[in-house]
Amino acid sequence: IVIGARFSDRVTGNAQKFAQNAKIIQIDVDVAEMNKNVMISAGVVGDIKVVLDRLNERLEQQDHAEWVTKIQEYKEKYPLVYHKDVLSGPFVVEEIYRQTKGEAIISTEVGQHQMWAAQFYKYTKPRTFLTSGGLGTMGYGLGAALGAKSGREDKVVVNIAGDGCFRMNMNEIATAVRHNIPVIQVVINNHVLGMVRQWQNLFYGQRYSATVDFVKLAEAMGAEGIRATTQEEFKSAFEKAMNLGSPVVIDCQIDSDDKVWPMVAPGAAISEAFDEADLKNK
């Protein structure tokens, strides 16, 4: 059942191979979306709230225990893994989870850090993961974090960003300082925008963009700035940030070659996703 989605390639991969064995029912307010990217089995044109209210009148409560068990089996069979001995994006997110005991509100920007935040923080409550999904809105997360902290002063609020995304809206740290909104800004800093760096390598004589000193930047705006280059340094930095009661920027220096797994190659189907082990076995 597809509700208000447009079947973009970020969701379907190769649209011709998407959910070939499924019956697809699409609900959308715009008739032009029907059968546009994926052929559907049935379509319902209407306001989603009205349609879902009508559907709920006819549906019985479902027991999803069997499906939840199956998902758990998949997680055990295909666990998320990463290199445990160095500071990395997955480690940073898992450590945030450990120190906040899963009770924080997490916001993200767009990119690798966004995927790691979704994969390695165990969300158990609604409205605790604020992200723009596949919309690609770099700069969204810090503003979302300020709003969340203003509305829920009792919660630890962390914006997880990459160095590129943070630069899109980093001036809002000054807003946090001015209004004393104690958000924790974690920058997973791999020093690159992957696609931009590729163009710089191929077409601009390897003249790469410079990386900003985020610690000095935070201090210039009146916030605490902390740099972490090891796991122990990040543990200490985040513990300090939680106890400080004022805006903090933690600059986490990670390897530029760290990748998110699994992934789907351009033009491939979702069923053709691969990970690092698959590459090594080729």
Labelled PLM ranges:
Residues 40-52, 171-188, 263-265:
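A short alpha/beta connector and helix-capping loop motif
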Residues 72-149:
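Active-site diphosphate/adenylate-binding microenvironment
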Residues 34-42, 127-131, 168, 196-207, ...:
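Short beta-alpha connecting loops at secondary-structure transitions
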Residues 10-11, 239-282:
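Glycine/aspartate-rich loop-and-adjacent alpha/beta segment that forms the canonical ThDP
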Residues 3-8, 115-193:
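Thiamine diphosphate
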Residues 51, 200-239:
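Conserved thiamine diphosphate
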Residues 2-70:
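Glycine-rich, acidic loop regions that bind phosphate or pyrophosphate groups
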